[in-house]
Amino acid sequence: MSDLHNESIFITGGGSGLGLALVERFIEEGAQVATLELSAAKVASLRQRFGEHILAVEGNVTCYADYQRAVDQILTRSGKLDCFIGNAGIWDHNASLVNTPAETLETGFHELFNVNVLGYLLGAKACAPALIAGEGSMIFTLSNAAWYPGGGGPLYTASKHAATGLIRQLAYELAPKVRVNGVGPCGMASDLRGPQALGQSETSIMQSLTPEKIAAILPLQFFPQPADFTGPYVMLASRRNNRALSGVMINADAGLAIRGIRHVAAGLDL
């Protein structure tokens, strides 16, 4: 039996991409899974596909009332909350400082930070009482842009650096009751969109990046799928496998940190 059997897991943005892969993985692990998802169509799809195994709540991560409504439903259903995974986010399609008009930069900043930073903070606030009571955990999705430049423009990169500070502060404030950690995946096949303020709300990340371009920059030389990143979340959510980690950010970058100066990887001819 999995360590996560009957654990109550709350994931934001569970309708597609990494969020959907996390829903699939935690259900596979035997957990009671809930998600807060903005898209009504994706909520309907989740309910149709997973039935009683999913509690899918339509709502916006920038709205505290939506979070509280979801948490209330989770507690009614499961009687507890063991892990909150803040995952919903948006990207800026590498919109640069120089080429973005000032007024667009300002509105884009507020929209992107509302989702990527405030959304995490509001989720933590809504989930904290139940997680403190059950001595559970929080996990937040970061990005390779939390460590390196070039994984997005200044708006996205700054938002992911802000999220690392949020993780550290929450880990400090909530210790010893709640473990707080992060996972930073590299580029993957997903439906990640951009801010409406930048005209990117209907543009997927895969319209800006090709599988070949992503694989070429990674020392492990493959095009990651969302399911490739679910393992660290499972480990961090498990009380048995993670008793000692808090304030830790796992850089799941397919080797980006060890790229060579002359070559992406030295073993390409092995």
From Swiss-Prot:
It catalyses: 3-(cis-5,6-dihydroxycyclohexa-1,3-dien-1-yl)propanoate + NAD(+) = 3-(2,3-dihydroxyphenyl)propanoate + NADH + H(+); (2E)-3-(cis-5,6-dihydroxycyclohexa-1,3-dien-1-yl)prop-2-enoate + NAD(+) = (2E)-3-(2,3-dihydroxyphenyl)prop-2-enoate + NADH + H(+). It is an enzyme of class 1 (oxidoreductase). InterPro entries: BphB-like_SDR, Dihydrodiol_DH_HcaB, NAD(P)-bd_dom_sf, Sc_DH/Rdtase_CS, SDR_fam. Its EC number is 1.3.1.87. One of its GO terms (biological process) is 3-phenylpropionate catabolic process. Coiled coil: none annotated. The keyword Thylakoid does not apply. The keyword Transferase does not apply. Substrate binds at S143. NAD(+) binds at residues 10-34. Pathway: Aromatic compound metabolism; 3-phenylpropanoate degradation. The active site is at Y156 (proton acceptor). Keywords: Aromatic hydrocarbons catabolism, NAD, Oxidoreductase. One of its GO terms (molecular function) is 2,3-dihydroxy-2,3-dihydro-phenylpropionate dehydrogenase activity. Converts 3-phenylpropionate-dihydrodiol (PP-dihydrodiol) and cinnamic acid-dihydrodiol (CI-dihydrodiol) into 3-(2,3-dihydroxylphenyl)propanoic acid (DHPP) and 2,3-dihydroxicinnamic acid (DHCI), respectively. NCBIfam families: 3PPDhyd_Dh_HcaB, PRK06200.1. Belongs to the short-chain dehydrogenases/reductases (SDR) family. This is 3-phenylpropionate-dihydrodiol/cinnamic acid-dihydrodiol dehydrogenase. It comes from Escherichia coli O157:H7.
